[in-house]
Amino acid sequence: VWNDYINGKTIMAVIIHTPEEIEKMRELGKLVAEALDYIGDFVKPGITTNELDKLVYDYHVNVQGGYPAPLHYGNPPYPKSCCTSVNHVICHGIPDDKPLKEGDIINIDLTIKKDGFHGDSSRMFTVGKVSPQAQRLIDVTHESMMAGIAAVKVGATLGDIGYACQNVAENAGYSVVQEFCGHGIGRDFHCEPQILHYGRKGQGMVLKAGMIFTIEPMINQGKRHLRILDDGWTVVTKDRKLSAQWEHEVLVTETGCEILTISPRTGKA
């Protein structure tokens, strides 16, 4: 989601979820993780992202009994059911008829809406065999996300999360996208707090039990600078070098945090 801090927008109150809401969010987190397990099996050379998108729509609606939240979201209305960001696309890549090819890397970002709640997660997938450089970017980006998640606990700050993500990425020689960030989630697709993937320890909002938000660092192989294409959605690296992203939904608990979007198939984050 767009980083509103850059634009000086007024930040609204953060929701502390009730036990009943938390249980629903666990259900939705499991659903979106199941959908990512499902769609990953189809990521192979020759398939188009449009074909993947149709599979996502069918799975969310006909198998899971929900609805793809990205479809018709925002302004201009997003035209598809998921985001498919290939190679130098940072985020919000719109599915199209171009076949994936051997060596591509792709982020698939899914959000399901059901019973008034949302589940949101994304993963990186490799198309056939990829270069060691591409695999390293994918691995470091996952490590960056997990470092951010490890910083989540009652009394920690948003700056602690951002610092942890940034530290991993920059120590590996990569850059962190600053214009887009994680977000609160629940009955709303996007709400407070905004989770920056860069920052200073001890700064920003203090975390409380019952908060639910995404941590989803976008890490570039080259410089952090980006541009948005004329479709109003697709975000690409300005230098056309590779970008990677992982996303999990996290609940702040009294004892630390709980990842709500772990893969049911592998049991891994």
Indicate where each model-derived feature is located:
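Active-site neighborhoods and metal-handling regions in enzymes and metal-associated proteins
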Residues: 2-269
